[in-house]
Amino acid sequence: EMDRILVASSNDKATAMLVSLLKETFPTCKTSIAATGLETRRAVGSGSYDCVVINCPLSDEYGNELAEIVCTSTDASCVAIAKSENADILADKLEDFGVMVIPKPLGRQYFYRSMKFVSAARKRMLGIRSENLKLHKKLEEIRTINRAKCSLMQYLGFTEQQAHKYLCLLYTSDAA
């Protein structure tokens, strides 16, 4: 589920519609609003969002560079909404960054399904990231153990097996 979503939109009517659709899709979600690309950059820099929805164009920029920045510098998912005649071109530019591009006019059901897909993809990505962090921690532990073994072998003349056994004894006596 999405907990915090930032809506970047310079059109008040479109902003109200997007907020309404997001509340239908994610009833418990907190929605913040930014009216310009600059406001969006500030909000993204100072807050943690699960997703940033950009209603292209914004008053101070189109929104494609903003979408790239969101995807490359934060953990947030990003959805760009663009006129149907621009959506394919925008998608070609942004999909490799992980931006979901949705064409206007916005269909309620299509928006709902797209946002649910973005949410599921984010959940999956966060699960993979968590697993990756665990593996990095495990790898660092192995490196530390190997450095300890090398020190025992170099300075105390232990064999690799003796160093391993010694470290295992230390570990089990510390755990007890």
Ranges and model annotations:
Residues 15, 37-40, 50-72, 85-86:
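Conserved phosphotransfer microenvironments
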Residues 64-65, 84-100:
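Alpha4 helix (beta4-alpha4-beta5 surface) of REC/receiver domains from two-component response regulators
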Residues 106-115:
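C-terminal output helix
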Residues 122-154:
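CheY-like receiver
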Residues 171-176:
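Conserved small/polar residues in nucleotide/adenosyl-binding loops
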